Regions:
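Membrane-embedded helix-loop-helix hairpins and adjacent transmembrane boundary segments
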Residues: 1-512
Length: 512
């Protein structure tokens, strides 16, 4: 068979498996608890792979590999930061959260927050739902954009056709199968991602002769690729940038798309094994991504030509190095395996899109319609409404992706991937951490944390970096870290200014 036939065969097989998962999961659909939380029946293997596949997105396959090509070993600060965040979420938060959500009978993160703070006004629920719909739409639109780019890069298919194919498949299994289909597909897709990010650098190291030749070649190309500071020393901007990379893992410590998996665990005893699986997955996949970029910088080097593209410069490895993985796959792998890597890149994208769409639909249907507008609605009606909401939110994200493609043709997807991720994390993570560990934390404090995080992400993205003096430091730090810390500080201050909440026996028992 010719190379294109192999590529299309691998893609068709991958898409067929996803559609089969959606059909199988839809046959088990009985009620809204099944649609949104898989009836809290998942084991550690499913939850660990699903949480990691969901938490990474296209950024792992295209963004982190590009970072490895652009900055070399400095990219390992991200690996360390993500490992710390993953372990913090599993070891410090998962058990308490799982215990409390069972005692509160929560199906969603807003369910948990409202029960934890006894918020009869539904303010926490409404703020949570609004933030999820806004930032999930942004995040998913970036992933849809990446789907079109993947089809374009690997197969030469028009961007719009690629978007239509990817969008149609992910909507089909997400709408029909709900959360269980999402988790099953995440296990499949997370396995593909891990396989691909271990196999490609292994083949690359074999081709180049090992680690020492890699180091020697990188030093000849650009010595700063072997420097943890990028060759600039520990200046304030470098320190801030390094902190920003290290603290990227904060986003795992409370983000609803991750914690929805902890909520669905069948038993808290699954957490220890799940933590180990998640840690190893992160170590291997993230390290493989950075190594892939570094190997691409050597194996695809073109002397005299810019390698890393910018807004003003066309680079051989694409803007920010984000084309290094597809180019290296074409360089090293036989045609039959190129088809596998198309599936792997799409796995990174779709495993995030499906999870976020079901999460946002739960916010709209469970947290607003059922809990606030129509408490008497039947479960069988909710499942149908949830499917409609998933479809509508997906169409909104598709519309945003098409608008961005039309008005900003020279875009890179990754700034608004990080923007959407940071928005979700800064809104929820401070409130989740304090709600699990600080009995003095109040309902008004939680509201203040969430609103502050929600507003500070665009502030630190678009306004603060342009300020004289401190602007470059905050620009290097990225928006998540300052927004996260400010949201936590404001929530603590508002809580201390108010009346102490009643003693929460369930919170005390969950900490034991």
């Amino acid at each position: 068979m010719d190379p294109m036939t192999w590529k299309l065969l691998g893609l068709a097989l991958y898409l067929a498996v996803l559609l089969g998962i959606g059909v199988a999961a839809s046959r088990k659909m009985e009620d809204v608890a099944e649609y949104f939380a898989a009836s809290k029946s998942l084991g550690f293997w499913s939850v660990a792979f699903s949480a990691r596949a969901t938490g990474e997105s296209a950024w792992l396959l295209l963004g982190l590999t590009g970072m490895g090509a652009a900055v070399g070993i400095r990219g390992f600060w991200v690996v360390l930061g993500e490992m710390l965040g993953v372990m913090g979420a599993w070891h410090l938060m998962a058990k308490r959260f799982n215990r409390l959500t069972r005692r509160y009978d929560s199906l969603t993160i807003p369910d948990y927050l409202e029960a934890r703070f006894r918020d009869d006004s539904h303010a926490l629920r409404l703020v949570s739902a609004g933030a999820l719909v806004v930032f999930v739409t942004i995040y998913v639109s970036a992933q849809i954009d990446a789907t079109g780019s993947a089809f374009e890069s690997f197969l030469g298919i028009d961007w719009f056709v690629g978007v239509a194919i990817g969008f149609g498949v992910v909507m089909a299994y997400s709408v029909t199968g709900g959360f269980k289909a999402v988790v099953w597909s995440d296990v499949f897709q997370g396995s593909l991602m891990l396989l691909g990010l271990v196999l490609l650098p292994a083949v690359g190291l074999w081709a180049i002769g090992g680690i020492r030749p890699l180091q020697a070649n990188l030093f000849v190309i650009e010595p700063h690729l072997l420097s943890a500071t990028g060759g600039k020393g520990w200046t304030p901007e470098v320190i801030a940038g390094t902190l920003g990379l290290l603290l990227i893992g904060l986003g795992f410590m409370g983000s609803p798309q991750i914690f929805a998996r902890f909520l669905a665990l069948r038993d808290e005893r699954e957490i220890r094994n799940g933590a180990l699986v998640a840690f190893l997955w992160t170590l291997l996949a993230d390290s493989g991504a950075v190594l892939t970029g570094m190997l691409g910088r050597v194996l695809l080097d073109r002397p005299g030509q810019p390698m890393i593209g910018t807004d003003d410069v066309v680079g051989a490895l694409g803007k920010g190095g984000q084309d290094v993985l597809p180019l290296l796959v074409d360089h090293l792998m036989p045609a039959a395996l190129v088809g596998l890597y198309i599936a792997i890149v799409l796995s990174a994208i779709m495993s995030t899109v499906d999870s976020l769409l079901v999460l946002a639909s739960s916010a709209a249907v469970r947290d607003v319609y059922q809990k606030v507008l129509n408490p008497d609605v039947r479960d069988d009606q909710l499942v149908g409404l949830s499917r409609i909401a998933t479809l509508v939110l997906g169409l909104l994200a598709l519309g945003l992706a098409l608008l961005v493609a039309f008005f900003v043709p020279g875009r890179t997807i990754f700034w608004f991937v990080i923007f959407g991720w940071s928005g979700i994390a800064a809104t929820f993570c401070p409130a989740m951490i304090l709600s699990l560990y600080w009995p003095r934390y109040t309902r008004n404090g939680a509201l203040a944390s969430m609103i502050t995080g929600f507003l500070c992400v665009p502030l630190f993205k678009f306004v603060v970096p342009g300020l004289p003096g401190v602007g470059p430091v905050f620009g290097a730090l990225e928006e998540l870290t300052p927004a996260f810390l400010l949201a936590m500080a404001v929530g603590a201050a508002v809580s201390l200014m108010g009346e102490p909440p009643p003693v929460d026996e369930e919170l005390r028992e969950a900490a034991e």
